[in-house]
């Protein structure tokens, strides 16, 4: 696709995805690549700008990440952040020092607003620092353009070569001028147009899919979630009835979800849809299994088996559509980030699979997927449907999965979702659900002692699922949810609310 590109070079920093999000907020496409990416690969990608992320290392560390010095002579603007700033100075023969005192948290910074980087900004503002080492001598051709009381070089520039470095983190909210500074880098330094929109993305994807597929047949694994739904519609717009969607109902869906999926895609979108009722098969495979990773793998493998069986019945199929999105790729592990969970879309595909993959959304964060869905005319309610994991309720029922536990979780979850909708909070909360933590506790109902299940409610705010905070749901809403669940769902006598952010917790419990 012909689009302007910024590369975010990953040095292992905790804010890498946030940097990418900040760039994309300016309608500029960017990709995160490992620091080991070769000069040849960078030249081939032809980025209009490069951003070095922060990272946990010191430039003097034995195994500290490095880049080839030639990168700074490519004529491509570079912005180094924190470790990226220090690495730029070190690579170009400046000096980096380790002081006795580190600088961490909100800090007042003095800015030279004659620099393009700080154009139209105040001379003094607030930034967020998180570093031990700092630049004590800038490289030849550079000048200092920002200072703090503790850091003699809070930012530097070589305006002629368009090389910039900042010791602080412009991507976080605590740097009050950070978004404006990144905008200056993108538009005043890199001279980008900012013309990457979701409508142009959809048009380009539809055109590319048409060219790739030709007159061949395509199948799509449809779950009814936002990602697979948008992926299916974008491919259907490209090739129409050449696409057949297979909906594997594994019996691990939310209340009435299977029927809703069938109705929307068969009736409303007029797609070729095959629904496979495989509940007994999946529950049989999960019998006696309580380890969450084993559950994920079993469901992923069985899903593929069922899917392949159905695909064979269709005859000559060349392509498989998947709703993989960018966080799936990032969280499933790169050179600089550990695997957090086995993602249902990324892991578990058999090596001998005969289909070629079509992943139209693999470049997008979740909020961008929703925007594409709106552009494609998908109903608002479906586009804003709750994120739902591939393994379904199997990872919201902690421990062994049984029909009884699924029924309890399904009913409690339906009540929670219903009350959130009644309170008008559906689109204010990123994700909300009930789970069964495999805990029983003593209670009293009427005059009798009970020993029943506990339901945990989880609700988070986020924009892309990379980080999240627990949602501050009004007490009166939580009270109503709690009273309804203990009165309407058998075998439940206690409700708890999860008040943990991500990190340290993940959004799902398993």
Curated annotation (Swiss-Prot):
Pathway, per record: Purine metabolism; GMP biosynthesis; GMP from XMP (L-Gln route): step 1/1
UniProtKB keywords: ATP-binding, Glutamine amidotransferase, GMP biosynthesis, Ligase, Nucleotide-binding, Purine biosynthesis
Signal peptide region: none
Domain GMPS ATP-PPase: 196-385
Catalytically driven reaction(s): XMP + L-glutamine + ATP + H2O = GMP + L-glutamate + AMP + diphosphate + 2 H(+)
GO CC entries: cytosol
Binding, ATP: 223-229
Protein EC: 6.3.5.2
Domain Glutamine amidotransferase type-1: 5-195
Active site positions, chain numbering: 82, 169, 171
GO MF entry, a single one: ATP binding
CDD domains listed in its UniProt record: GATase1_GMP_Synthase, GMP_synthase_C
Oligomeric form and interacting partners: Homodimer.
Function recorded in the entry: Catalyzes the synthesis of GMP from XMP.
The protein's name in its UniProt record: GMP synthase [glutamine-hydrolyzing]
Species in which this protein is naturally found: Clostridium botulinum (strain 657 / Type Ba4)
